[in-house]
Amino acid sequence: MARTVNCVYLNKEAEGLGFQLYPGDLGKRIFDNVSKEAWALWQSKQTMLINEKKLNMMNVEDRKFLEEQMVNFLFEGKDVEIEGYVPQKDDE
């Protein structure tokens, strides 16, 4: 049986993560309050941020920036600002 959480990002009950994917207290908070669906949305935004801003995950400042963006996205309802990115429009 799948574990469910009250996802703070989606604002609904949804399937939770299978295990804690991020270390520390923030990882516990994510595990307890973020759904698989919301985490997948974050991962796509994270990939775009890393690529567009050319972040180096060996650099402490870049990791801190990415963590701040993650908290803003998942818990504070702020969208990720990606310079130069224009969402694809649906053709009607």
From Swiss-Prot:
What are the GO MF terms of this UniProt record?
iron ion binding
| Keyword Cell wall biogenesis/degradation listed | no
GO BP term (any one): cellular response to oxidative stress
Pfam families noted in UniProt: Iron_traffic (PF04362)
User: Which keywords appear in this protein's UniProt record, sorted alphabetically?
Assistant: Iron
Which Gene Ontology CC terms are recorded? cytosol
InterPro entries xref list? Fe_traffick_prot_YggX, Fe_traffick_prot_YggX_sf
Record flagged with keyword Iron: yes
Protein family (similarity comment) = Belongs to the Fe(2+)-trafficking protein family.
Q: Which PANTHER family match?
A: FE(2+)-TRAFFICKING PROTEIN-RELATED
Which HAMAP family is this protein grouped with? Fe_traffic_YggX
Q: What does this protein do?
A: Could be a mediator in iron transactions between iron acquisition and iron-requiring processes, such as synthesis and/or repair of Fe-S clusters in biosynthetic enzymes.
Q: What is the protein's name according to its record? A: Probable Fe(2+)-trafficking protein
Organism in which the protein naturally occurs: Shewanella pealeana (strain ATCC 700345 / ANG-SQ1)
